[in-house]
Amino acid sequence: MSGTDQNEAVTAPATVEVEAKTPALTSNQLNKLRHEAHRHGNYTSYYTFRSQIVPDPRLTQLQSFVQGRRTLDLGCNSGKLTLELATHFAASQVVGVDLDAGLIAAAHEAKRVALSEGQKVKNVTFEEFDFANTWPLQGTAAGRWDVVMLLSVVKWLHLNNSDAVLVELFKRLFEIVAPGGYLVLEPQDWSNYKRAVTKCPSLKENFKKLELRPPFTETLLNGGWEEVDGWERDEFGFERSVRIWKRPANGEQ
C-alpha cells in the first residue's frame, strides 16, 4: 500500500449512525389512545373506578326483582356484579355477556376464585359476543329470561351503533323477557355522551346522527314496556338513574 493510500485509510471519515428517536407521547395523547381502545366502554379497570362496596350498591335496590329469577347481565365487564347477583341476591341462574375477550377471561377467573372460596356461583356462566348485533343470543345466554340488565352500557351501545340498532335491541329484549319479567336500564345523561365523544373522537360521526335521547321513555313505552320503578344514584363520578321496565304479564294492560 502506498503512503498516499495509507494516509487516505487513516483520514477517511467514519460513518456516524444517528439513532432516530420517536417523540414521547403526551399524557393527553396516551389518554386518547386508551379511550379509543375502550370505545365500547370495556375498560379493564372499570370496577376500580367505582367504590369497592360489596355488594354493588345498585343491587341492594334490585334484590326484590332478581331473587329467585333467571337473570341475564348484558355488558357484564369483568363479572363482578354478575357474580354478586348469585352470591348476595340468590338469582336462580345468571349469565354475563360481554364482547371483550379479556374481560370475559377475567370473569371466568373471578368465578374460579369464588368457587375456591366456597361461594355459591356454580349457576353463573359467561359468554363472549356482541349482543347488540347478534341474534338470537348465543350459548347459555339463549332462551327466555325473567330479568335482563343493561347497566352502564346503554350509552356505549348507542354511540357505537345507531338509533335503529338500539330500538331493535329493545324490541328483541321484549321478546326474550318472560311476561311479567323486567328490563333494568341504567341510562346516562346526554352530557355523558358528549364527554365520551370528546375522549374518543372516533365516535363523533355516529354521535352526530343520533336523534333518540336517554332515558328513551317514549321508545320503550311504544315497544310495550311499562315503567314500574326507578331511582337516582349519586355515587362519585357515576351520577345517573336506574329504571325498571316490565313486560306486562298476559292479560295485564
PLM ranges: what are they?
Residues 149:
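A conserved beta-strand element that flanks and buttresses the S-adenosyl-L-methionine
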Residues 179-187:
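Conserved beta-strand signature within the Rossmann-like core of class I S-adenosyl-L-methionine
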Residues 69-77:
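Conserved class I S-adenosyl-L-methionine
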Residues 167-179:
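A short glycine-rich, Lys/Arg-flanked "PGG" loop and its adjoining helix->strand segment in the class I
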Residues 93-98:
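Conserved SAM-binding motif I beta-strand of class I
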Residues 78-90:
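Conserved SAM-binding loop of SAM-dependent methyltransferases across substrates and taxa
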Residues 109-139:
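S-adenosyl-L-methionine
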Residues 48-68, 84:
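Conserved alpha-helix/loop element of class I SAM-dependent methyltransferases that forms part
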